[in-house]
A protein has these predicted regions:
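N-terminal secretory signal peptides and thylakoid transit peptides that target proteins
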Residues: 2-20
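C-terminal segment of N-terminal export signals and the immediately downstream linker at the start
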Residues: 27-63
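Conserved Rossmann-like nucleotide-binding pocket used by diverse enzymes
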Residues: 56, 82, 108, 153, ...
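Active-site loop/oxyanion-hole signature of alpha/beta-hydrolase fold enzymes
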Residues: 62-63, 102, 109-155
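A short loop-to-beta-strand scaffold at the N-terminal edge of the catalytic core in hydrolase folds
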Residues: 63-71
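Conserved HGGG/HGGXW glycine-rich cap/lid loop of the alpha/beta-hydrolase fold
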Residues: 72-119
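Ligand-binding pocket scaffold of soluble enzyme catalytic domains
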Residues: 92, 124, 133-137, 161, ...
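Conserved hydrolase catalytic core segment
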Residues: 148-181
Length: 181
């Protein structure tokens, strides 16, 4: 299978799974609207088909890392954290994040260890790619951003990471979408 075909397949599976999970949340607005009307998005963010970048990239010190992440949507909206897999990065969610943001969700998409602008704070910190370590990184990110509870979504390594988070810290997980994990 070519890399391009594999990338498109993963994107389709991830977007479909997230769409299936989040579709019921938007159905109330559609069901209560009058025939012939289209409900307005919850925020001023308009999803762009074929987007190639995020509106903003940020950094925050969290646990043993300085984590780079994209954020979209209203600051006080319900939080969705999307976790990429290996060897992908946050741009796997560049088409999904604006859709969730337009539906009123605060979307946080972090670069995992070794990706993008995420770096270790100390050269002495052991390098570890286990999903349990990555789950602890996402928990530290939630603490740094003062997020008490979030809907967690991920694919590949990200799926395993959110599975671990839901198992070890269920009080921090509102819901979970795990694709290929």
């Amino acid at each position: 299978m070519s890399d391009e075909l594999d990338r498109k397949r993963r994107h389709f599976v991830g977007a479909t799974a997230l769409g299936m999970v989040f579709a019921p949340f938007g159905m109330n607005a559609i069901a209560s609207s009058k025939p012939g009307t289209v409900p307005a998005p919850a925020t001023g963010t308009t999803p762009l088909a074929g987007a190639t970048s995020f509106h903003s990239l940020k950094q925050v010190k969290a646990g043993v890392l300085d984590i780079g992440y994209a954020e979209d949507g209203p600051a006080r909206g319900p939080v969705v954290i999307l976790v990429h897999g290996w060897p992908y990065d946050i741009y796997s969610f560049v088409d999904v994040a604006p859709i969730l943001a337009a539906a009123g969700y605060r979307v946080v998409v972090p670069f995992l260890r070794g990706y993008g602008s995420t770096t270790f704070l100390s050269a002495d910190t052991p390098r570890n790619g286990q999903q349990a370590a990555i789950a602890a990184d996402i928990l530290a990110l939630m603490d740094a951003l003062k997020i008490k509870k979030a809907t967690l979504g991920g694919f590949d390594w990200g799926a395993r990471t959110v599975n671990i988070m839901a198992a070890l810290w269920p009080e921090r997980c509102k819901a979970m979408v795990s694709v290929s994990g």
